[in-house]
UniProtKB/Swiss-Prot annotation:
Protein name: Glutamate racemase
Annotated Pfam families: Asp_Glu_race
Pathway in which this enzyme or protein is active: Cell wall biogenesis; peptidoglycan biosynthesis
Native organism: Streptococcus pyogenes serotype M5 (strain Manfredo)
Gene: murI
HAMAP family attached to this UniProt entry: Glu_racemase (MF_00258)
Biological process, per Gene Ontology: cell wall organization; peptidoglycan biosynthetic process; regulation of cell shape
EC top class, as a word: isomerase
Swiss-Prot/TrEMBL keywords: Cell shape, Cell wall biogenesis/degradation, Isomerase, Peptidoglycan synthesis
Residues engaged in binding substrate: 10-11, 42-43, 74-75, 184-185
Reactions accelerated catalytically: L-glutamate = D-glutamate
Catalytic-site annotation from UniProt: 73 (proton donor/acceptor), 183 (proton donor/acceptor)
């Protein structure tokens, strides 16, 4: 038994989509979450800067005595995950491979779309992972740089959001049967995305898919939390306005949480 928390990092609130699934599947595990909303989005930033910011988030989580770190951010996974994983002596998990694997299982026509930040799409990481496992699958990647700002400003239900999503996704409509939401912010726009793509297109939430891998690693390293613990205390930190973070989190997690401000 290991009652230390699992650490989650993201460029903002998007990683809460992963946390929500973890709380559902593994309610006995403690969580420490850090969202760097003050510097979001990461996607348009240079690689060197993304790596620097990611290490700051990692080092913060290490001060919280975490037993595992989850990169609940596709951009950080694409740029810094391998380096951080090699440097630390605790398990470090990214969201890309679980999402890629789920897309392969989902597609019936071998036509997969991937949407993400400019950096995630430019890295070509999803296409590489998908075609490594299933060379015959065709992958169409599309950067959607306007999606993260919509979520971070809590405008997911606005008419502006609907127009931006419609305009952004039009190149993929009618061309794929599976769409990977290659940014953990994007599930917060899921209803609009599904409406634009149509009911026949299966949406893959890369963040939610990685919770299965978290469970596997907890078992493999024998670091599961206390299954009998009913009241688990989670901690949430943001580099921006805690009230906005709390408002979005309460909608997604369906519970009120305390959010602390931190300066990195």
């Amino acid at each position: 038994m290991d009652t230390r928390p699992i650490g989650f990092l993201d460029s903002g609130v998007g990683g809460l989509t992963v946390v929500c699934e973890l709380i559902r599947q593994l309610p006995h595990e403690k969580i420490v979450y850090i969202g760097d909303s003050a510097r979001a989005p990461y996607g348009p930033r240079p690689k060197k800067q993304i790596k620097e910011y990611t290490w700051e988030l990692v080092n913060f989580l290490l001060t919280q005595n975490v037993k595992m770190i989850v990169f609940a951010c596709n951009t950080a996974t694409a740029v810094a995950w391998e380096e951080v994983k090699a440097a630390l002596d605790i398990p470090v998990l990214g969201v890309v491979l679980p999402g890629a694997s789920a897309a392969i299982k989902s597609t019936t026509k071998g036509q997969v779309g991937v949407i993400g930040t400019p950096m995630t799409v430019a890295s070509d990481i999803y296409r590489k992972k998908i075609q490594l496992l299933a060379p015959s699958v065709q992958v169409r990647s599309l950067a959607c740089p306007k999606f993260v700002p919509i979520v971070e400003s809590n405008e997911m239900c606005s008419s502006i959001a609907k127009k931006i999503v419609y305009d952004s996704l039009s190149p993929l409509v009618g061309k794929i049967d599976t769409l990977v939401l290659g940014c953990t912010h994007y599930p917060l726009l899921r209803p609009i995305i599904q409406n634009v793509m149509g009911p026949s297109v299966k949406l893959i939430d890369s963040g939610a898919e990685c919770v299965r891998d978290i469970s596997v690693l907890l078992n493999y390293f024998d670091i599961n939390g206390n299954y009998h613990q009913k009241a688990v205390e989670h901690r949430f930190f943001t580099t921006a306005n805690p009230e906005i973070f709390q408002e979005i989190a309460s909608i997604w997690l369906k519970q009120k949480i305390n959010v602390e401000h931190v300066t990195l």
